[in-house]
Amino acid sequence: MAAAAFFLLVGAQHIMVSEAFACKPCFSTHLSDIKTNTTAAAGFMVLQNINCSRPHEASATQGQVPSRKSSQCREAVGVPQYITITANVTDESYLYNADLLMLSACLFYASEMSEKGFKVIFGNVSGVVSACVNFTDYVAHVTQHTQQHHLVINHIRLLHFLTPSAMRWATTIACLFAILLAI
């Protein structure tokens, strides 16, 4: 009986997924070209529910723009793959520009996670460009951070609180400064 249980445990170890990823969708649904190559992270699985901070506001804005997909809240379940992103930056459509701003916010998130020591992988998760980090490492980091600094705020993460409107204004102001510096 003990030998049978041992073999079941050994067999279950090979069935279990060896590593999970926590992914943040970049909401870039209108990018002109998303190519996946064959270097997928084989055997890896994404199990992370992405919640929006204001789901009612997102659904209200979706009713005004009929060409958008139903929701920007997605449950990212899939296999992360390395991707190439090509964006159509000459298009004057507001939706393309908004998606590029959301992609830039995702790049800021990825750089912040990289600064904290995480290896960030950009992947095509269920057709959505996502920034993925190792879920086990992320949980360990959050646990360690909350145990050491449970009530101490040692840095302000400003980029996480920027809305698309604020990103547009920040981009406009940055462009104006660049033009003034060039003159």
UniProtKB/Swiss-Prot annotation:
Main location: virion
Residues carrying sugar: 37, 51, 88, 124, 134
Signal peptide interval: 1-22
UniProt GO BP: symbiont entry into host cell; virion attachment to host cell
Localization (cell): Virion membrane; Host endoplasmic reticulum membrane; Host Golgi apparatus membrane; Secreted
Pfam families: Arteri_GP4 (PF02497)
Keyword tags: Glycoprotein, Host endoplasmic reticulum, Host Golgi apparatus, Host membrane, Host-virus interaction, Membrane, Secreted, Signal, Transmembrane, Transmembrane helix, Viral attachment to host cell, Viral envelope protein, Virion, Virus entry into host cell
Residue ranges annotated as Virion surface topological domain: 23-160
Segments traversing the membrane: 161-181
Membrane topology of the entry: Single-pass type I membrane protein
Gene Ontology cellular-component terms listed: extracellular region; host cell endoplasmic reticulum membrane; host cell Golgi membrane; membrane; viral envelope; virion membrane
Intravirion domain ranges by topology: 182-183
Disulfide bonds: none
Assembly and interaction partners: Heterotrimer of GP2a, GP3, and GP4. The GP2a-GP3-GP4 complex associates with the E protein. Interacts with glycoprotein 5. Interacts with host CD163; this interaction plays a role in virus entry into host cell.
Purpose of the protein: Minor envelope protein. Along with GP2a, serves as the viral attachment protein responsible for mediating interactions with CD163 thereby playing a role in virus entry into susceptible host cells.
Family: Belongs to the arteriviridae GP4 protein family.
Name of the protein described by the UniProt record: Glycoprotein 4
